Amino acid sequence: MAYKSQHGVDDMVMLSKIANDSILDNLKKRYGGDVIYTYIGNVLISVNPFKQIKNLYSERNLLEYRGKFRYELPPHAYAVADDMYRSMYAEGQSQCVIISGESGAGKTEAAKLIMQYIAAVSGKGADVSRVKDVILESNPLLEAFGNAKTLRNNNSSRFGKYMEVQFNGIGDPEGGRVTNYLLEKSRVVYQTKGERNFHIFYQLLSGANQQLKSELRLDTPDKFNYLSASGCYTVDGVDDSGEFQDVCKAMKVIGLTDSEQKEVFRLVAAILYLGNVGFKNNAKDEAAIDQQSKKALENFAFLMQTDVSSCEKALCFRTISTGTQGRSARVSTYACPQNSEGAYYSRDALAKALYSRLFDWIVGRVNSALGYKQNSQSLMIGILDIYGFEIFEKNGFEQMVINYVNERLQQIFIELTLKTEQEEYFNEGIQWEQIDYFNNKICCDLIESKKPAGILTILDDVCNFPKGDDQKFLDRLKESFSSHAHFQSAAQSSSSFTIKHYAGDVEYCAEGFVDKNKDLLFNDLVELAACTTSKLIPQLFPEINCEKDKRKPTTAGFKIKESIGALVKALSACTPHYIRCIKPNGNKRANDFDTSLVMHQVKYLGLLENVRIRRAGYAYRQTYDKFFYRYRVCCKETWPNWTGGFESGVETILKSMDLEPKQYSKGKTKIFIRAPETVFNLEELRERKVFTYANKLQRFFLRFTLMSYYYSIQKGAADSMKSNKERRRLSIERPYQGDYINYRENFELKDIVKKNGNEKIMFTHAVNKYDRRSRCQRRVLLLSDTAIYFIATEKNKDKEDRKKRPWIYVQKRRLLLAGITSVELSKLSDGFVVLKTMNEHDQIFECRRKTEFLGTLIKAYKTGTLRINYNNSIGVAIKASKQGGKGKERIILFEKGIKPGESVFKGTKVSTPSDGLPADTVPNLTPPESLPVVSIPIYKPAMNAKNAPQNSGGPASNVKPSAKALYDFDAESSMELSFKEGDILTVLDQSSGDWWDAELKGRRGKVPSNYLQLIKNAAPPRAGGPPVPTGNRAPTTTTTSGGSTRGGFNNGPSTAPSGRGAAPPSSRGGMAPRGGSVAPPSSRGGIAPRGGIAPRGGMAPRGGMAPRV
C-alpha cells in the first residue's frame, strides 16, 4: 500500500502548480511538521533540521525500509540506501550517491546514514563484521582530523571524501577504500574569528587522561597560538572529551596499536607547540628564536623526538645550492639565514605539511583495514561527501577550489539528470518538448580550461616565473577575462576578482593565491624529519629515502584538477543517486525557516527544472533485452519459453499488465515507462513469481534431504533394536518429525540453548523424568549436537514479570554427549531410557518416541561408537542429594504386564504393556532414490524472430488412477475426505506428495496417501510423476518424487493381529500425513506440516531441526 503524507506532497513531481513558490511552500510545510525529506522523482531533497527528530533514525525505522519500494514509506535517506543496495544486484551495476549542498546543509550526516543502513542490512560473518566496523568507525576518526567548526556549520567537512565499498556475491561488504580530496590545511595555522581548528586538537586537550597530558606536556587551548587566535574553544552540544574516547576506539578498530596512537597524539601536540615558536630579527636582519618561545621550541623538539638545534636551524635557515648537478660539475651549498618573515613562513609550512601528511597516513591506515581488492570484479557502492559551496566575507584560494569542485558536481548532476535525459529521448525517437535549463559548463571552463587558459592554468603559469606574484596573477586574469560573462574584475586598485558561480557571485581576494598554489616545502624542513627517532614521522616523508626528483613539483591547482577528473570518471562508471541538501537558515537554529535563503538554494540547485523534466518525462527506461530477461517471469506467455524477439516480448509483458499505450513508449533500443508505480508493480509481481518457483525447487530438494536424513535415523535405531527389544505397534511404522514441541517458535527455549553457544537442536519432546524416589516429573527434552537438556516449567517468582509471564522455563540438567558412557533400555515394549554418565548420576526418563530419540542420539554422538545395552534389569546410579553427585546404584526391574496400554513405574519395578510386537519386527525401509537430473533446453529470443512459441505437446491421458483404502480415515476439516477400509477412491491429483486429491461417491477432498494403495494396472500419474511400485504386501510402500518412502512393516508370518493386516499409520501428531515433512504446501510455499517443523519459504526450518541443505 502506498504511503500518504499529511504534510504536503512526498514527491514534488505531484505538485498541482509547478513553480519555485510551490516548491518552497511544500518544503516549508514539511519542515514545520518535522518532515525533512522530499522526493523529486528519484532525487532526495533533505532539509537540515538542526535537531534530533524522535525515532527518525531508530533501528526499528531503519529495518522498516529494508526491501520496501519507494512509495510504500515516507521519503528517507534509508530509502535511497536501500534502492542502491538492491539495484546493485538487480542490475549487476555499481552504484553511487552524490550528496551536494552548501556548507551546513547536512551532507556529512546524510553520508553517515547511507553507511549505517548498508552496515545494518548486510551479513554478520566475522570478516564482514570487520569491514563494517571499519566503515562505521572510520567516520568519527576522519571527522576528528578532517572536520572543524565554521561560522556556518559546527561540523563542517574541511576535506572531500569518496568512500567505495566492495560487495561479494551475496551482498556482504568485503572491502573498500577512502579517497580524500584537498584537506584545508591552512586551517591548521589560521582560523577566522568564531571558528575552530580541526576537532582533534580540542579533543586531545580535553579528553586525554592525566598521564597522557603529562607525557605530551599538554596545556589548555588558550595557551596555544594555533587555537587561541580565533577566540573559540568549545561548540554548543559537543562533548570533546567523550568524542576523544570515540576516536581512540576507532583507532583500535582500524588496527592502530597503543604505541602508534601515542605517536599520532604526540605529533598533534608537537604541531601545537610549533605554533608557539616566535621569531625576531637580530642586528643583521636575520631571524632568531624569540626568548619567550625557547620553551615552546624545546617542547616541539621533545615531541618531534629530535634535538633543539636541528629544529632551530630548519626554521631560521634555508639551504641554497648553486651550480649544475652532475659528476664533473661543482655544486656549492649555502645555509642562508632567513628574516623573521621567512622563518614564520617556514614554521607554518612545516605545521601544515606535518598535519596534512598525518591525515593522509590515517586515511591510508583506514584503507589498509578495509582491504580494497585490486582488479576485483566486485560490485561497489560509492558515497561522495565533499565540502559544500562557501561564501565568506573574505574568500581565498581554498574557497575558490571548494566552489570549483561544487561547480563540477553540479555539472555532473546536469549532465546525468537534465541534459542526458533529454538527449536520450531525442536519440531514441521519443516525442519530447525541449525544456531549457542553465548549463554551468561555461563556469567550469572558466576555472579549469587548458585552451584557452582558465584561471587555474593561468595561476600555474604565473607560479612558473621566479618573479610571479599575486598582482601578476590578477593582471593576467583581467587581461584574459575582461569580457567573460562569468568573470568580473574589481576596481583598478583592488586585489580581488569575482566569479559568477551557479550558486551566486563570489568575490575572491587574490592575496596568497600564488604561494598556496606552489605549496612549497623547503628541503631543510623535509630533512628535519630525517633527524627524528620517531617511527611515525619518517613514514610521512617518503622523499627522505628517495633520490631527489629533478622534475618541477606539481601545484595544488594541478593536483585538484587531476583528482576531480579521476572522481568524475569513477562516478560516471556507476549508476548515480542524488541527495540534495538544503540549509533552512544561516544561524544553525532548529524550527527556523529562512524563506529567502531557501528560495536562493531552490533556484541555484535547479529544482524547478528537475521537477519539470521528471514530470514530463519517463520514470524508468531499460534496453529491451535486459527488461525482457528481468520481467519475463511475470507473464505466462513469455515464461518459461519465448521464441519471439525481445521487443515483442517486452510488449507482451506490458500488455499482460493491462497498461494503456500512453503509459509507456517504445524507443529504438529501449522501453520507456512513464509512472514509477508501474515498475513497482512489476517488481512486486516478479518477486512473488520468483518466490513461488524458488520454493517449488526448495521443497523438492528439502523433501529429498529430509528423507535421506530421517532414513539414516530410522535405520540406525532399527539396526540397534533388531532382535533386542520388543516394539510398540505405533512405533514401528511411525514417520519421524524431529520437533514435537514447536521449538522453532519457542524463543524462551532458544535463549536457554544460546547461553551455551551455537548448538543445533536435532530432537525435542516432552518426557517423564523420574527422580531418586521414583517420582514422575514432566520435563522438556532437547537433544542438540552437543548436549541433552532437561528443562522444567515453573511458576515465575518475579512479581513484576509474573504479570506477563506466569510460567517460565528453567534448565534442570544439561548432559554433554561426550560424558554419556552408555544408553540402557529394557527388552520389552516400554519407552524407558537410562543415560549412564561418567561422573554424574544417571538419568532415567520415559519418552513416547524413544526410537526416534535413540536414532538421533546415535547420529549426534561423536565420541566413538555409542554403547547401547538391552536388559530387563538395569542399574541406575541415583542422585546423592539435592546438591547433586553420584549416589548409590538402584536396580530397576522391567516385567511384562497383563494389559495393553502404558507402562507403570512403582518403586523399583516397571510394568510394561502386554501387546508388544516381537523383537525381530523391523520397519520396511527403502533407501531414498538419487536426485533425478533433467536437461531443459534454454530458449534465447532473437531480436527479429517471427516464429511463434513452440507447442509443448498433446495433453496427458484423462484416465484417473484408482486406489484402495487400507485403513479408516475420519476427516477433521471440510477440505478432507472421509473413507472406510476397503473403499475404492479415484485419485485426481498426486502432485502434493503425502496429501492427494481424491473422489469417493461424488465427494471430493484431501486424503492421506499412505492410507491408500494404488490398484495395479491403474492409469499412471501425470507425465513426469513418480513411479508406482507394485506388489501385494500390506500395506504397500509408495515412493514420492525425491525418493520419499512410506509404508507399513514386515513382521513375519505370525505378527499380524486378527482382522487387520497391519495397524493404520499414525494420523494425529505424527510426521505424515498430518504433520510430516512431506505435507501439503503452505500458503508461503514451504513444506508446512500441522504441528511439525515447517520452514517458512526457506530451505531449512528456523529452529534448526532439519539437516542443513
From Swiss-Prot:
Record keywords: Actin-binding, ATP-binding, Cell projection, Chemotaxis, Cytoplasm, Motor protein, Myosin, Nucleotide-binding, Phagocytosis, SH3 domain
Q: What happens when the gene is disrupted?
A: MyoB and myoD double mutant exhibits reduction in the speed of whole cell translocation. myoB, myoC and myoD triple mutant exhibits reduction in the speed of whole cell translocation.
Does the UniProt entry include the keyword Cytoplasm? yes
Renumbered residue ranges of the record's region Disordered: 1017-1109
Q: What biological processes does GO assign it? A: actin filament organization; actin filament polymerization; chemotaxis to cAMP; endocytosis; phagocytosis, engulfment
Q: Where in the cell is it found?
A: Cell projection, Pseudopodium; Cytoplasm, Cell cortex
Tell whether Ribonucleoprotein is among the UniProt keywords.
Answer: no
Q: Matching InterPro entries, A to Z? A: Kinesin_motor_dom_sf, Myosin_head_motor_dom-like, Myosin_TH1, MYSc_Myo1, P-loop_NTPase, SH3-like_dom_sf, SH3_domain
Q: Per the database record, which ranges form the SH3 domain?
A: 958-1017
GO function term, MF aspect, one: phospholipid binding
SMART domains reported in the protein's UniProt record: MYSc, SH3
* Bias type Low complexity, positions: 1030-1043
- Region (Actin-binding) location: 564-586
Q: Which family does it belong to?
A: Belongs to the TRAFAC class myosin-kinesin ATPase superfamily. Myosin family.
Please identify the protein, giving its name as recorded.
Myosin ID heavy chain
Its organism's taxonomic lineage begins at: Eukaryota, Amoebozoa, Evosea, Eumycetozoa, Dictyostelia
